[in-house]
Amino acid sequence: MVYELKSPLLGFEEIKEFDLVEVDEMFAKIKAINNPSIEITLANPYALREYSFDIPAYIQALLDINAQSKVRVFCTVVIQNPIDESRVNFLAPLIFNDDNQTAAQIALSIKDYPDFSVADKIKNYVKE
C-alpha cells in the first residue's frame, strides 16, 4: 500500500511517498516511490516487546488520527549479519494511518521513555 509521508523521515528527507510491504507479523519494508533503491526494513515493536507511547497531538492532526482510525506502528531496523545483531530504533517510530494512507515519523525523548533506545539489539527481544 502506498503512503504519503506527511513529515520527513529522519535521514531520508527527500522521500515523500513509499510503498509499505509487510513481510510477516514481525517485519515490513518501505520502498521509496521516487527512488526504489531506497528500501528500509521495519519491525513491529509490539511483536518484540512491551511498547507504549503517546502520539503527539500535532502528529494526530497531521495524519488525521481519531479514536476510530486504523493506526499501525513500526520501528526502523538496521540489519546486521548475523541477524540477531540487528538493531531496532524504538525512539523514532513510524506511525501509519491506514484510513487515509498517510504516515509520519516521530522522535520520542529518552527522558520520557528511558526504556527505549535508538539501537537495541533484536536478540534482546527475539526468543530462539
Swiss-Prot record:
Gene Ontology terms describing biological process: bacterial-type flagellum assembly; regulation of translation
Keyword DNA-binding applies: no
Gene3D superfamilies, sorted: BH3618-like
Compartments, record wording: Cytoplasm
Disulfide topology: none
Protein keywords: Bacterial flagellum biogenesis, Chaperone, Cytoplasm, Translation regulation
One Gene Ontology cellular component annotation held by this UniProt entry: cytoplasm
Matches recorded under SUPFAM superfamilies: BH3618-like
Any Pfam family matching the protein: FliW
PANTHER family: FLAGELLAR ASSEMBLY FACTOR FLIW
NCBIfam families: PRK13282.1, PRK13283.1
Complexes and interactors: Interacts with translational regulator CsrA and flagellin(s).
The protein, known as: Flagellar assembly factor FliW 1
Organism: Wolinella succinogenes (strain ATCC 29543 / DSM 1740 / CCUG 13145 / JCM 31913 / LMG 7466 / NCTC 11488 / FDC 602W)
